[in-house]
Amino acid sequence: EEGAVTGVRGEKDTYPAEAVVLATGGVSYPATGSTGDGYRMAAQLGHEIVPPHGSLVPLVSEDEACRQMQGLALKNVELTVLNRKGKAIFREFGEMLFTHFGVSGPLVLSASAHLRNWEKDTYRLSIDLKPALDEQKLESRILRDLGEAPNRSVERIFSGLVPHSMVPVILNRLGMDPQQQANAVTREQRRALVQLLKHFTMPVTGPRPVAEAIITSGGVKVGQVQPATMASKLV
């Protein structure tokens, strides 16, 4: 009334109040009862609504490697997200998980909050599988492993470098025969392996549905809300 909220009107009754708290939740996790109705209510009061979308959400990748490594959790890796221009927009150390649809886990959920421009930009992930070693030290480690078992297959050698389910993917990307002996590995193959372990890349095509997101990004435009009290500046 006269630009002020004076209560809540239900289907049968009206509840007068000096103030009304609008706390309906976002559109993520609808199983909790959050339907996003609060956006409609706020809009009816004149508030501008920034289109809501899921945040802290798993990411979809069409890279077949994700399906091949489904269920594999990587620990102590560094994840970098690059945009179309190759600029790093996220970099963090931690854990992630390969799934049947792409990638998930703490690192990926954190990264998803920085990917807001799917309509105009493209993104790819770059995983440093050995962040504790620079390229020179990693190559020395590989040389040592190859030299200690010169007649062993690279398939077995690589199992000491990466998780077992990742070995076929590594060999496929390098174009190497799993049964190639360690003493037959060329300098070029060794350096290609170093690059792959430090920059294991894959494209991502978008986030999973908002129903799977942990939080909602967007909603009532923050400039129309008092930051100290969260009270509306409009009513």
Predicted segments, located by residue:
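Glycine-rich nucleotide phosphate-binding loop and flanking beta-alpha elements
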Residues: V27-P30, G105, L115, A228-T229
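General beta-strand structural signal in soluble alpha/beta enzymes
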Residues: L22, I49-P52, G206-P207
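Short hydrophobic core segments
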Residues: V8, Y15-P30, A42-A43, M96-F101, ...
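A conserved short coil-to-beta-strand element within the FAD-binding core of flavoproteins
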Residues: E1-A4
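An anion/pyrophosphate-binding glycine-rich loop and adjacent beta-alpha core
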Residues: H47-H53, P58-Q181
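A glycine-rich dinucleotide-binding beta-alpha-beta segment and adjacent secondary-structure elements
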Residues: P168-V235
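Glycine-rich beta-alpha-beta "Rossmann" dinucleotide-binding loop(s) and their flanking helix/strand
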Residues: P30-V50
